[in-house]
């Protein structure tokens, strides 16, 4: 009986180790969905732009676009989600242009024309390089930069905002942490899963002093609405919550009548 019990215990731990090893190796493909092909550019959307070339760690080349607006006071530093690349963010770029913002959007390492490999560390580093480009190359004042992050880009935005004094922070359809997502998806078994990534926004958000606008939809089928609410509740700075309607990737367009005015009002409320 004792031998049987020991065999069951050993089998359980071997199985758990095997599952974790498999998931650990698979996690990059589950978190990052980069596409290399640039399918369109702002010029095809009727917007003039400047191709931006940055360097990560003085070696890895990053690619992005800078769009200026003659009446802009603020600049949107745009961090997109985990799929595609900057060429799939035309709707958002056009909206920000209509709202009279300058826009800098970059592709993380491994996305679009950017070199390297996507990782949690390289995403954070890419964000810092983009920030420094605005400050040093475009001579943009920190208080005139609004950091914007959608979905996974929200975690990138929070990390950067916790380290700099931006004018504002907009988080759309994002989450509190990867652990919280796994807890919801796997419930009681989640603590047995070893995670390769943290993206722990809920801890970092407490260090953000800039005003924050959080946008989320109860219809979001990718990032649970409750995680957006949890992140919002953890903010200690001045904050606003906008509830939109629609699915994860389409909600902002389906709620355009409330979405655009809310972003405009938020920007006007900044010092």
Give residue ranges: language-model regions.
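Short alpha-helix in the alpha/beta-hydrolase fold that links the catalytic acid
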Residues: 92, 201, 210, 224-233
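Membrane-embedded segments
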Residues: 57-134
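Short beta-strand/loop motif that positions the catalytic acidic residue
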Residues: 208-209, 214-216, 220
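An N-terminal hydrophobic leader/cap segment in hydrolases
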Residues: 8, 12-55
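Hydrolase active-site cap/lid region
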Residues: 154-210, 243, 251-253, 257
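Alpha/beta-hydrolase fold nucleophile elbow
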Residues: 140-151
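Catalytic histidine neighborhood in serine/cysteine hydrolases
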Residues: 232-251
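Acidic catalytic loop of the alpha/beta-hydrolase fold
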Residues: 219-223, 249-250
């Amino acid at each position: 009986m004792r031998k049987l019990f020991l065999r069951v215990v050993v089998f359980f731990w071997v199985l758990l180790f095997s599952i974790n090893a498999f998931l650990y190796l698979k996690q990059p493909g589950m978190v990052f969905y980069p596409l290399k092909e640039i399918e369109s550019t702002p010029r095809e959307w009727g917007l003039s732009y400047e191709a931006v070339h940055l360097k990560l760690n003085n070696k890895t080349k990053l690619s992005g676009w800078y769009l200026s607006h003659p009446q802009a006071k603020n600049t949107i530093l745009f961090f997109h989600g985990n799929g595609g690349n900057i060429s799939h963010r035309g709707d958002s770029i056009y909206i920000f242009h209509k709202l009279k913002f300058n826009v800098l959007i970059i592709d993380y390492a491994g996305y679009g024309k950017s070199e390297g490999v996507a990782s949690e560390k390289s995403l954070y580093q890419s964000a810092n390089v983009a920030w420094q480009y605005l400050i040093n190359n475009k001579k943009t004042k920190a208080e005139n930069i609004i950091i914007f992050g959608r979905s996974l880009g929200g975690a990138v935005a929070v990390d950067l905002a916790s380290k700099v004094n931006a004018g504002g922070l907009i988080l759309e359809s994002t989450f509190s942490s990867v652990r919280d997502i796994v807890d919801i998806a796997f419930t009681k078994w989640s603590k047995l899963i070893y995670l390769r990534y943290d993206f722990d926004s809920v801890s970092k958000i407490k260090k953000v002093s800039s005003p924050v606008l959080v946008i989320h939809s109860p219809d979001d089928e990718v990032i649970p609405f409750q995680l957006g609410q949890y992140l919002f509740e953890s903010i200690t700075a001045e904050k606003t919550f906008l509830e939109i309607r629609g699915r994860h990737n389409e909600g902002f367009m389906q709620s355009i009548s409330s979405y655009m005015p809310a972003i405009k009002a938020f920007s006007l409320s900044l010092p």
